Amino acid sequence: MRHPFKVVVVTGVPGVGKTTVIKELQGLAEKEGVKLHIVNFGSFMLDTAVKLGLVEDRDKIRTLPLRRQLELQREAAKRIVAEASKALGGDGVLIIDTHALVKTVAGYWPGLPKHVLDELKPDMIAVVEASPEEVAARQARDTTRYRVDIGGVEGVKRLMENARAASIASAIQYASTVAIVENREGEAAKAAEELLRLIKNL
């Protein structure tokens, strides 16, 4: 039911700041002697997609045909576990930066369906949240990413509600805990402290 190492899936809608929280978490964990191996699920999908000549950047992955995304998703999960097994052995925590729900050209798509969960076997699914207004503002400021299709404050609000529900639905399959971590503006370090506290209690 579980890997020798602990698995924590950190989710959040685009622009919520989960990657920033994870970076803060890494620094805190190092200070406290907690061994982490951090991966970005999208990077693993992108690597395979680029090699196959399907896309040039990660924001284009969600525009691919759904069945193609499914293949990339399955391959990413397998590669992540293989890498973590080598890096962590039987000790430490695998942190996976990903989305519980992705807005695609064919509708909302689960980031943590059964075939992915069967590979990852998460101990915890952490949902990083902020107010929809803050998230929409962060999206607007980030000119390095294409997020126009998310849909402004109302679009963010709907996506956040559905993503939280998707996280809980995914957690049921593996009896994973679900943790809601608030990432208020300028308080990523505080969010990381809370996340580390929860991880240490697993």
Curated annotation (Swiss-Prot):
The keyword Cell membrane does not apply. SMART domains: AAA. HAMAP family: Adenylate_kinase_AdkA. Belongs to the archaeal adenylate kinase family. Pfam families: AAA_17. Its EC number is 2.7.4.3. Transmembrane segments: none annotated. Keywords: ATP-binding, Cytoplasm, Kinase, Nucleotide-binding, Transferase. It is found in: Cytoplasm. This is Adenylate kinase. It is an enzyme of class 2 (transferase). ATP binds at G12, V13, P14, G15, V16, G17, K18, T19, T20. InterPro entries: AAA+_ATPase, Adenylate_kinase_AdkA, P-loop_NTPase. GO terms for cellular component: cytoplasm. SUPFAM superfamilies: P-loop containing nucleoside triphosphate hydrolases (SSF52540).
